[in-house]
Each structure stands twice: as C-alpha cells, then as structure tokens.
Amino acid sequence: MIQVAKIIGTGLATTGLIGAGIGIGVVFGSLIIGVSRNPSLKSQLFAYAILGFAFSEATGLFALMMAFLLLYVA
C-alpha cells in the first residue's frame, strides 16, 4: 500500500513539468514575436529569453527532484 502511494505521489509531483514546458514555450514564442517586431533588439531579447528559460527550467527540475525524492527516499 505504501509503495502504491509512493508511485501515485511521484506521478502527481511530475505534473509540475507540464508548467515548465508551457513556460518555455511561452518564453521562446515571445522571443520570436519580439524579434519579428524589432530585429535590432535581437541580442538583448535573446539574453532575456535565456534567463526566462533558466527560471522556467529550474522549476521543472525542482518538481522532478521532488518526484525522485518521493520515489526513492521516502
């Protein structure tokens, strides 16, 4: 019974990866729109996009880390 609860909890913890995927899509979609509107700001917008990607990916990695902790440690 405990093993089943671990697996269910791990599956629920990985749903945080959905938000990270959506966030990364929004960041790079906005980068494409911004560059198409003003190509002269490409380097500055790209730097902001990489920063947004890093923050979004970090939340996804935290969710994945929690899932692994629930599965293997708890």
Swiss-Prot record:
One BP annotation, GO: proton motive force-driven ATP synthesis
Q: Where in the cell is it found?
A: Mitochondrion inner membrane
Q: Which residues form a coiled coil?
A: none
Q: Name one GO cellular component term.
A: mitochondrial inner membrane
Q: Which PROSITE patterns match?
A: ATPASE_C
Tell me, what's a Pfam family for it? ATP-synt_C
What are the TM regions of this chain, as residue ranges? 16-36, 50-70
Site residues by UniProt (Reversibly protonated during proton transport): 57
Its record classes its membrane topology as: Multi-pass membrane protein
Keyword set for this entry?
CF(0), Hydrogen ion transport, Ion transport, Lipid-binding, Membrane, Mitochondrion, Mitochondrion inner membrane, Transmembrane, Transmembrane helix, Transport
GO molecular function annotations of the record: ATP hydrolysis activity; identical protein binding; lipid binding; proton-transporting ATP synthase activity, rotational mechanism
Claim: Transport is one of the keywords in the record: yes
Q: Which family does it belong to?
A: Belongs to the ATPase C chain family.
Its function, per the record, reads: Mitochondrial membrane ATP synthase (F(1)F(0) ATP synthase or Complex V) produces ATP from ADP in the presence of a proton gradient across the membrane which is generated by electron transport complexes of the respiratory chain. F-type ATPases consist of two structural domains, F(1) - containing the extramembraneous catalytic core and F(0) - containing the membrane proton channel, linked together by a central stalk and a peripheral stalk. During catalysis, ATP synthesis in the catalytic domain of F(1) is coupled via a rotary mechanism of the central stalk subunits to proton translocation.
State the oligomer form and interacting partners.
F-type ATPases have 2 components, CF(1) - the catalytic core - and CF(0) - the membrane proton channel. CF(1) has five subunits: alpha(3), beta(3), gamma(1), delta(1), epsilon(1). CF(0) has three main subunits: a, b and c.
What is this protein's name? Answer: ATP synthase subunit 9, mitochondrial
